[in-house]
Swiss-Prot record:
Function statement: ATP-dependent specificity component of the Clp protease. It directs the protease to specific substrates. Can perform chaperone functions in the absence of ClpP.
Pfam families: AAA_2 (PF07724), ClpB_D2-small (PF10431), zf-C4_ClpX (PF06689)
GO CC term (a single one): HslUV protease complex
Statement: the UniProt record of this protein carries the keyword Chaperone: yes
Subunit structure: Component of the ClpX-ClpP complex. Forms a hexameric ring that, in the presence of ATP, binds to fourteen ClpP subunits assembled into a disk-like structure with a central cavity, resembling the structure of eukaryotic proteasomes.
A GO term, aspect molecular function: zinc ion binding
CDD domains reported for this sequence: RecA-like_ClpX
UniProt organism field: Methylobacterium radiotolerans (strain ATCC 27329 / DSM 1819 / JCM 2831 / NBRC 15690 / NCIMB 10815 / 0-1)
Protein's recorded name: ATP-dependent Clp protease ATP-binding subunit ClpX
Positions bound to ATP: 119-126
Domain ClpX-type ZB: 3-56
Gene label: clpX
UniProt family annotation: Belongs to the ClpX chaperone family.
GO biological process, one term: proteolysis involved in protein catabolic process
Length: 423
């Protein structure tokens, strides 16, 4: 423990690691003979996280084991146990296949791209992002709704590979082992089962264009991005070992799955079908490739995505956990934001339950949680920088319902004055 000279030496305490005084930091934790401040604790935690990320348990192939991949996914994504297991095995096998690509030439292992099917806000995008973080490979996201056939206004499918190249700093070797996540894949389904005079340039046409790069081809990628620079030299990227993960909400697919096998009949002798009262996520667990064909995906495209992982609807308990438990949980993010104003932010348990219920009512899943919290905390974040001596803000259920303002707890940090409360 360090001390100042003179009369202050008995009263002022210092961090034994960085030397800051108790007045310069929020918290000072005492040990037997030393002190450590909250900033040094955070720094130590960051170092431990980085080291744990690099010390993943790996199999003999140098690839993280499925259980280890699952464990790290659990740190960031709540629930979705079935999808995590499917993804962990598929990704492990994919990179194990790459590790043995040159060792055995008698049997060629085919690539297994992945299809994620789940309601909005169930964690599809977050799962793909976390996988790339675990494996330390280039990762890019693409929106299927912006893609069109070559020659039409919109993005070419080759632009997806360009984004992957940019994510790998134009290192072609690294890009060829990366992960591509294509979101909103359900939006490029065929518009109709019947052939039309007009071309479906953003539906079936895009599916046809994606086939080759997903299966494996040498794509000619313009480094400056497409059609505006026709004279530029092209980079050659082999997509054979790029893992493609496609995700979509597939609204209406649950009806196709429920109707499968029931048959149809009309007339007085027709059997009345009981409505399927299962939740959407439960119905998705029964999905078959034939259901995706009826939805509007072409057979060749479905065949390029042999691994199907379905995600479930998030209930109130899961949404509450999402608010609090992941490493980058929303409550932790807002608490950190308030810490910058030297204020503790506290949510009562019933308040978090109400936030979760609101997200369920809006049918936005986890994606809607941030919007709800922003609305609740807007006035507080507006007023707080101009208020003095506020030490704590408490959010109760009445605040979430809009019936009252947050509770402000005032106090003087420099004196032994009693705290005061205001609403």
């Amino acid at each position: 423990m360090s001390k100042t000279g003179g009369n202050d030496s008995k009263s002022t305490l210092y961090c034994s690691f960085c030397g800051k005084s108790q007045h310069e930091v929020r918290k000072l934790i005492a040990g037997p003979t030393v002190f450590i401040c909250d900033e040094c604790v955070e720094l130590c935690m960051d170092i431990i996280r980085e080291e744990s990320k690099s010390s993943l348990v790996k199999s003999r192939d140098g690839v993280p084991t499925p259980k280890e991949i699952r464990r790290v996914l659990d740190d960031y994504v709540i629930g979705q146990d079935f999808a995590k297991k499917v993804l962990s095995v598929a990704v492990h096998n994919h990179y194990k296949r790459l590790a043995h690509a040159t060792k055995h030439n008698d049997v060629e292992l085919a690539k297994s791209n992945i299809m994620l099917i789940g309601p909005t806000g169930s964690g599809k995008t977050l799962l793909a992002q976390t996988l790339a973080r675990i494996l330390d490979v280039p990762f890019t996201m693409a929106d299927a709704t912006t893609l069109t056939e070559a020659g039409y206004v919109g993005e070419d499918v080759e632009n997806i590979i360009l984004k992957l190249l940019q994510a790998s700093d134009y290192n072609v070797e690294r890009a060829q082992r990366g992960i591509v996540y294509i979101d909103e894949i359900d939006k490029i389904s065929r518009k109709s089962d019947n052939p039309s005079i007009t071309r479906d340039v953003s539906g079936e046409g895009v599916q046809q264009a994606l086939l080759k790069i997903m299966e494996g081809t040498v794509a000619s990628v313009p480094p400056q991005g497409g059609r505006k620079h026709p004279q530029q030299e092209f980079l050659q990227v082999d997509t054979t070992n790029i893992l493609f993960i496609c995700g979509g909400a597939f609204a209406g697919l649950e009806r196709i799955i429920s109707q499968r096998g029931k048959g149809t009949s009309i007339g007085f002798g027709a059997t009345v079908q009981a409505p399927d009262d299962r939740r959407t996520g439960e119905i998705f667990r029964s999905v078959e490739p034939e259901d995706l064909l009826k939805f509007g995906l072409i057979p060749e495209f479905v065949g390029r995505l042999p691994v199907l992982a379905t995600l479930e609807d998030l209930d109130e308990a899961a949404l509450k956990k999402i608010l609090q438990e992941p490493k980058n949980a929303l409550v932790k993010q807002y608490q950190r934001l308030f810490e910058m104003e030297n204020v503790d932010l506290t949510f009562q348990d019933e308040a978090l339950s109400l936030v979760a219920r609101k997200a369920i009512e809006r049918k936005t899943g986890a994606r809607g949680l941030r919007s709800i919290l922003e609305t609740i905390l807007l006035d507080t974040m507006y007023d707080l920088p101009g208020l003095e001596s506020v030490e704590q803000v408490v959010i109760g259920p009445e605040v979430v319902e809009g019936k009252s303002r947050p509770l402000y707890i005032h106090g003087d940090r420099n004196k032994d004055a009693p705290a005061s409360v205001s609403a």
